[in-house]
Amino acid sequence: MNIINLGILAHIDAGKTSVTENLLFASGATEKCGRVDNGDTITDSMDIEKRRGITVRASTTSIIWNGVKCNIIDTPGHMDFIAEVERTFKMLDGAVLILSAKEGIQAQTKLLFNTLQKLQIPTIIFINKIDRDGVNLERLYLDIKTNLSQDVLFMQTVVDGLVYPICSQTYIKEEYKEFVCNHDDNILERYLADSEISPADYWNTIIDLVAKAKVYPVLHGSAMFNIGINELLDAISSFILPPESVSNRLSAYLYKIEHDPKGHKRSFLKIIDGSLRLRDIVRINDSEKFIKIKNLKTIYQGRKINVDEVGANDIAIVEDMEDFRIGDYLGTKPCLIQGLSHQHPALKSSVRPDRSEERSKVISALNTLWIEDPSLSFSINSYSDELEISLYGLTQKEIIQTLLEERFSVKVHFDEIKTIYKERPVKKVNKIIQIEVPPNPYWATIGLTLEPLPLGTGLQIESDISYGYLNHSFQNAVFEGIRMSCQSGLHGWEVTDLKVTFTQAEYYSPVSTPADFRQLTPYVFRLALQQSGVDILEPMLYFELQIPQAASSKAITDLQKMMSEIEDISCNNEWCHIKGKVPYNTSKDYASEVSSYTKGLGVFMVKPCGYQITKGDYSDNIRMNEKDKILFMFQKSNVIKIMERSGNFYKAIQ
């Protein structure tokens, strides 16, 4: 039996989960069709998903149709969970991209399609909700060709809310023959030579073109009324082909972790090559660590079943493997889809329990959520001791807050959400703190040079000190101190895009330790940073704005107000296409504004493109002034228990 792994993708409220539930029901995997409104869906299994009617975590189920086993991965539709969607792309053989016939193409739709196109993932476009009042399919077809691709093949016509095929193994419209010829040289040569070409020949060529992601078939339906679902199943089993196995050696990729109500850990793996068997002893990540497979399940017709073996391209589930982490692999390192650019969160907030004694409980719960979703980043601020979480958006914050309360029984409060800025030194500086020169309490001399690097370079660390004079353990301690120092600059944000050179060192052999160098480094670094000053960097987005020509003047005015950098404008009689860069902070709500003033016709698509020096206002990420921070570091070291906040002290260390 052929096995394929299919992603179901869509913008929010396009009916993605409803389509998935109908696929399960129509294929016989379930006895009734789950409804989002009723909270009885199979794929949205979390209580919060059922209650809010949105998908938070990618879920996997399975159907069989026309002799093909299809593992369906239902992904979140909200931008706040884009990291979950990106992980899914790595394991797909194909995708169904769902559009709402009423709302049309949204910014998320285009972002998803562009990624599918870039990664050359075979994709079927399914226009859902054709039963809705006010649907204008002709306008949507034009929108698809304008904003997604010209290489689409409309497989059906819609009459009175029902779908009828116009392209199949037995029949193909004349204009579609020309379409196929324009995309395949072999068919074109036969066509020009007046050779006989049957509908089946055209059909097989279309299958090949779809498999190569050169053509995108478009189907129609209504999940609400089970219209077009069987036709979609036929298209999936025809157009999405399984990859060829290249080896019999085990290669498996861990893409999902979940915990059951009793806390047992389930790890989901895609078997890339070979097979995984019960009681196998397998290697993790080419390391020296081996595990024994003590239990093994797969998904069959919507149910998890115990098996002795899971073969290539299928999904395996292993329970209670505590060492597993998302992204791990078993056996040979797999060749996964490349080219994904991970999007980092641009927001952060402090979180605290309503009851202070439950802080450790919150940290434990967040660690569990991090195991299930590695994009969830949290840390303890080394200065304020606050627990901070990085976020993609407000919806993610609300989901985390609800999960902590309902799943882990701990109520928390989130402080104001801030944009994540960064800092970079303004100029090259050098700073030295000498051994035995008060108030230096450490048996160490350290000199550091800081110099700015081009944006996007990151942190570079070099040493001018020979290992013959100062051995590895001492120098590594300095490097650790530098990395720690970069976590919080003068305004409390990460310091990046700089080179730090370890330029001077002195120690006393009987008493100096690596700890002296590790603990002194942050003081030297901070004083150097104060001497240099910093540029504040803000997150930037690359944008593409597609709007009707009549709205172009307003759009350009808006973009100027948002301090964008317009790189290209191209217009025709009907549409205007604008590209450029815009600060995240000024544009985070603009997609909904575009939809409003263009009456749903405009699309504002964005993706992260790094940081640049801010042109507008910014917020600090600190709770104490800078001199207090230096004092705080000395006191925290436990070397100086009490130190007077005297001007002489600050003068001495500066």
UniProtKB/Swiss-Prot annotation:
Keyword Cell membrane carried by entry = no
Q: Where along this sequence does the record place binding of GTP? A: 10-17, 74-78, 128-131
Q: Which domain of life is it from?
A: Bacteria
Identify the keywords attached in UniProt to this record, alphabetized. Antibiotic resistance, GTP-binding, Nucleotide-binding, Protein biosynthesis
Q: The tr-type G domain covers which part of the protein? A: 1-244
What does the record give as the function of this protein? Abolishes the inhibitory effect of tetracyclin on protein synthesis by a non-covalent modification of the ribosomes.
Q: PROSITE patterns, per this entry? A: G_TR_1, G_TR_2
What is the designated name of this protein?
Tetracycline resistance protein TetQ
Q: Which organism is it from?
A: Prevotella intermedia
Is this entry keyworded Transmembrane? Answer: no
What Gene Ontology molecular function terms does this protein carry? GTP binding; GTPase activity
One GO process term, biological-process aspect: ribosome disassembly
Q: Which CDD domains match?
A: Tet_C (cd03711), Tet_II (cd03690), Tet_III (cd16258), Tet_like_IV (cd01684), TetM_like (cd04168)
Q: Please report which protein family the annotation says this sequence is part of.
A: Belongs to the TRAFAC class translation factor GTPase superfamily. Classic translation factor GTPase family. TetM/TetO subfamily.
**Gene3D superfamilies (alphabetical):** 3.30.230.10, 3.30.70.240, Elongation Factor G (Translational Gtpase), domain 3, P-loop containing nucleotide triphosphate hydrolases, Translation factors
